[in-house]
Amino acid sequence: MNITSLQQNITRSWQIPFTNSSDSIVTVGDRNLTIDEVVNVARHGTQVRLTDNADVIRGVQASCDYINNAVETAQPIYGVTSGFGGMADVVISREQAAELQTNLIWFLKSGAGNKLSLADVRAAMLLRANSHLYGASGIRLELIQRIETFLNAGVTPHVYEFGSIGASGDLVPLSYITGALIGLDPSFTVDFDGKEMDAVTALSRLGLPKLQLQPKEGLAMMNGTSVMTGIAANCVYDAKVLLALTMGVHALAIQGLYGTNQSFHPFIHQCKPHPGQLWTADQMFSLLKDSSLVREELDGKHEYRGKDLIQDRYSLRCLAQFIGPIVDGVSEITKQIEVEMNSVTDNPLIDVENQVSYHGGNFLGQYVGVTMDRLRYYIGLLAKHIDVQIALLVSPEFSNGLPPSLVGNSDRKVNMGLKGLQISGNSIMPLLSFYGNSLADRFPTHAEQFNQNINSQGYISANLTRRSVDIFQNYMAIALMFGVQAVDLRTYKMKGHYDARTCLSPNTVQLYTAVCEVVGKPLTSVRPYIWNDNEQCLDEHIARISADIAGGGLIVQAVEHIFSSLKST
């Protein structure tokens, strides 16, 4: 397989065609969706079932009845008997109430840029259905059921990456989903189980008629944070996978550098008991346990080695203190995104019990904008930390005697080892750090006739986080390649052969062997991963590893124990 094909595979891993996974069912409407459930529906085709709770169904119908009565009695309600946004002073008659909703789709059909991944759109659809089942939106059950049908049949509307400022929700992106659901016009297109077609044809194949929106329904569908939150949910999941892999990379790097295990002694971290620091230290303690490639100093003694430092440099010694805040931050981000996932985010909201509606602002995606800004910042920190470890590995004066640039066959004088690979990584790390800059504070105050004069930029922030995650996967591939080569060379320096499996800790052997299998490296004691520069294509190896990570393959499975532990923090 050539490099182009491998890169296309990476792209397709986020454009996952519908694959029906009937092993489980995700029930929507009980207000307890998790990120894992969103990912299972979005990427793996897990079937969706709307709750059959009678109270929920009655609430949905009661909210519709309230809206219909309000229209009949000409009650002043935003977006139902009034115009939108800065034109909310326009009075809408009973005869125009339904047309207003359809017209909302048309004037919002203004997206630009590339299409979102199918997985991110599917996540958005799931969350929109979940929000509407609260019974505060004034939308028919039939329309919510249509979302369920689309998800279970693998019909995914095409949505564009630009168009939402995250203020009145994701108006423009959701207009594409709504237009496709009701079959408004052939210009709305979908992916139908891997095939592109217009939404009208898709409805026909599903045996569904076109739908005419009723009062409030267009606004209910388009006025909410579901798209940005769906993207965010997928990104949080991916970031946790990458954080687990980061721990594995550091464990390989520490063993490659012949670092000490003393830095992770429980006593140190009990003296500064931040939850994330404790978790990180405990995980690294476990990852390094029984390794022959670390200095065994858990007894508190310090091995003095002449000209070498008596203690490790900060990137090793302070690892738990550096990554700990990120672990705590990701845990908080997870909680906030899951609250947003299980919220009602349109406007106005209907209190059916008290027969009153309220004008509010739950559509503002500030929680998503701020959390995604934070997540990108954390990714930048993780990448910079790994970059420092790589710099130590390639420099003999800092690596405890490994060859320069981790050259495999030093007898072949033209070999430059992983010099080019480091440069490639150096080109990625600054970009990830740059992407860590915030967007939520860069909003236009004049948006939509100064009506949306504060806005979250949550949608763009979530999309940029998706980009950051994708790039970090490539960087992680590079880091893993360095880790494998380093432990091979360290094994040779200490044992006279290159089979690192005999020296690595039991908890890192699986990651090592997974990387070797993905890139096609023979497990041998005769040669390290990279022997001569001209015997492999490093770009193909980057692509193979990146694709494996994106698809949740062998490499991700090798750190499942870390990932599972991380999810419980």
Swiss-Prot record:
Which PROSITE patterns does the entry mention? PAL_HISTIDASE (PS00488)
For the keyword Cytoplasm, the answer is yes
Question: How does the record characterize pH dependence?
Answer: Optimum pH is 7.7-8.5.
Among its keywords, does the record have Cytoplasm?
A: yes
Q: What is its EC number?
A: 4.3.1.24
Which terms does the record give in the GO molecular function aspect?
Answer: phenylalanine ammonia-lyase activity
Subcellular locations according to the entry: Cytoplasm
Using the UniProt entry, state the residues involved in the cross-link 5-imidazolinone (Ala-Gly), renumbered to this chain.
Answer: 167-169
The pathway where this protein functions is: Phenylpropanoid metabolism; trans-cinnamate biosynthesis; trans-cinnamate from L-phenylalanine: step 1/1
State the UniProt keywords alphabetically. Cytoplasm, Lyase, Phenylalanine catabolism, Phenylpropanoid metabolism
Q: Where is the active site?
A: 78 (proton donor/acceptor)
List this protein's GO terms for biological process.
aromatic amino acid metabolic process; cinnamic acid biosynthetic process; L-phenylalanine catabolic process; phenylpropanoid biosynthetic process; protein homotetramerization
Q: Top enzyme class of this protein? A: lyase
Q: Which residues bind (E)-cinnamate?
A: 223, 311, 317, 347, 419, 448, 451
User: Catalysed reaction(s)?
Assistant: L-phenylalanine = (E)-cinnamate + NH4(+)
A single Gene Ontology CC term: cytoplasm
A matching Pfam family: Lyase_aromatic
Which parts of the sequence carry 2,3-didehydroalanine (Ser)?
Answer: 168
Question: How this protein is processed and modified after translation, per its record?
Answer: Contains an active site 4-methylidene-imidazol-5-one (MIO), which is formed autocatalytically by cyclization and dehydration of residues Ala-Ser-Gly.
Quaternary structure (record): Homotetramer.
Its biological purpose is as follows: Catalyzes the non-oxidative deamination of L-phenylalanine to form trans-cinnamic acid, the first step in the phenylpropanoid pathway.
Give the family, as the similarity comment puts it: Belongs to the PAL/histidase family.
Protein name per UniProt: Phenylalanine ammonia-lyase
Source organism of the structure: Nostoc punctiforme (strain ATCC 29133 / PCC 73102)
